[in-house]
Amino acid sequence: MGCAEFKKLWEKYEKGTLTHDEQERLESHIETCEECEVHLDELLAKSEPIKKRLPPKDLKVPFWRIKWKHRLQTVGFILVICIVIYMIGGVLSAFYFQADNDKRLKEIRDVPSLALEATIPNSRVMGGGTSVEAFFRTNSQFDLVKTIGKKEMPLGTIETSSFLSSLNITHKSWVNMRYQPNIHFVHPKIKQGDYLKDASKKVWDTLAKVHEGTVAEVAISFDKPYTLQELEPLLYGVFEAQELPPTPVWYALDTGQERINEEDFILSGGDFIGFPEHIGFLDDEAKNLKTQEAKVIEMMRILSTHEKTVNKVAMLPEDQLNLDKRYKYVKDNGVKVYGMVITGPSKELLKLQNSPHVRYATLGDIEVWNWFDH
């Protein structure tokens, strides 16, 4: 029957003889007394005969309002607690990702960007962003473009979410529905000379037929791996001195893990690793690396350290890329490339057919003329 202190008031309540002052006193007490609140619930749940003995209407004893007021207070208290916990989670997330000069936040952004550019030929991450959420979560968007001539064409958008350092792909959308680039390479150790010559002839014939006012994207495979310094005179020998010669935009990196199979020798997406002409880092130390070779080796180090993330971004089996072995090979043997994606005027690219160093070619996209310096 409620607590002993208010026993007499409860008896008056059941008889319907409470005064207005006694009613207010009992209401205030019920809000702070769990025992009396339980007793009130029991009284309200009783059958009709008990309800008939409730105080007359003119006494205005709305005890049901006390019950609901208490419930709303409880709900409000829970909501406040949830908001406080969420705010604390946000502060902890900000501290976790932005500590040490945003190191973890840069990793969340850097690794997927490098992975996309390393596994998708002629791709660059040129937009998007990362938002830090409560409880050590982030959401990121990566806007990809490809370079055809002097124009950057939208390629697609990748969206990711992460918890701590674990990353997942949440959405992929390509401009051309399903992205299937016609960019392939062949390793120099493959001996299928006749096939490579015939397949490449189709590319050269197409470039010969297209209008002069076009630019194109061509992937070429070399007769051996070359250093970046060795490529400069090789390309100069093809295009000679020009104000705006065709531009290399992506390189197929020789990592010692390329498939060498005379029956299955065409390397497509997932079979190779490469790097763009301009490797983008968020980390200040990596950005300050002086040479392209040093940047490539650092890129491979980062990718090998985060192999699970790279495989998720590239949507490849965990054992396919062997990034640890690739990184070690490049570090020990230096940066050499066995192919590249190059873009420029279609008729200029046609000159590559005369180079003794080009064994194989595939044709990517062709666009209307945009070959001018902005």
Which role fits each region the language model picked out?
Residues 1-10:
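Short, charge-enriched, intrinsically disordered boundary segments that mark the beginning
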Residues 15-16, 44-51:
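Short cysteine/histidine-rich zinc-coordinating motifs and their immediately flanking basic loops
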Residues 17-42:
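N-terminal amphipathic alpha-helical interaction or autoinhibitory segments
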Residues 48-65, 94-193:
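N-terminal, intrinsically disordered, polar/charged segments of Gram-positive cell-envelope systems
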Residues 62-70, 74:
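Membrane-helix interfacial "entry" motifs
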Residues 75-92:
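Hydrophobic membrane-insertion alpha-helices, especially the h-region
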Residues 142-280:
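Extracytoplasmic beta-rich ectodomain segments of secreted or membrane-anchored proteins
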Residues 282-374:
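Extracytoplasmic/luminal low-complexity segments enriched in Pro/Gly and acidic/polar residues
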